[in-house]
Amino acid sequence: MAAQEQQQPQSRETETEVDVPEAPPAAPEAQASEATQGVDDLLDEIDGVLESNAEEFVRAFVQKGGQ
């Protein structure tokens, strides 16, 4: 058998690492406020649908034929 040479990856000295600062994390109360606002918007949308189409909404969930 022939001897196999192993090739080692060579480091590139021309590459430079740039230290990019990360954005500071939002304050916990700001994150909670954003999440709460999203939930509030969704609940408002559901309330609007129920106010305008409550009967149709309920009919969509009525079981038919013993299902």
From Swiss-Prot:
Residues 25-61 are annotated as: ARC ATPase binding. Strongly interacts with the proteasome-associated ATPase ARC through a hydrophobic interface; the interacting region of Pup lies in its C-terminal half. There is one Pup binding site per ARC hexamer ring. Protein modifier that is covalently attached to lysine residues of substrate proteins, thereby targeting them for proteasomal degradation. The tagging system is termed pupylation. The N-terminal unstructured half of Pup provides a signal required to initiate unfolding and degradation by the proteasome but is not needed for pupylation, while the C-terminal helical half of Pup interacts with ARC to target proteins to the proteasome. The keyword Coiled coil applies. This is Prokaryotic ubiquitin-like protein Pup. One of its GO terms (molecular function) is proteasome binding. Residues 1-11 have a biased composition (Polar residues). NCBIfam families: pupylate_cterm (TIGR03687). It comes from Paenarthrobacter aurescens (strain TC1). Pathway: Protein degradation; proteasomal Pup-dependent pathway. Keywords: Coiled coil, Isopeptide bond, Ubl conjugation pathway. One of its GO terms (biological process) is modification-dependent protein catabolic process. Is modified by deamidation of its C-terminal glutamine to glutamate by the deamidase Dop, a prerequisite to the subsequent pupylation process. There is a cross-link at Q67 (Isoglutamyl lysine isopeptide (Gln-Lys) (interchain with K-? in acceptor proteins)). The modification Deamidated glutamine is found at Q67. Residues 29-49 form a coiled coil. Residues 28-37 have a biased composition (Low complexity). Residues 1-38 are annotated as: Disordered. Pfam families: Pup. Belongs to the prokaryotic ubiquitin-like protein family.
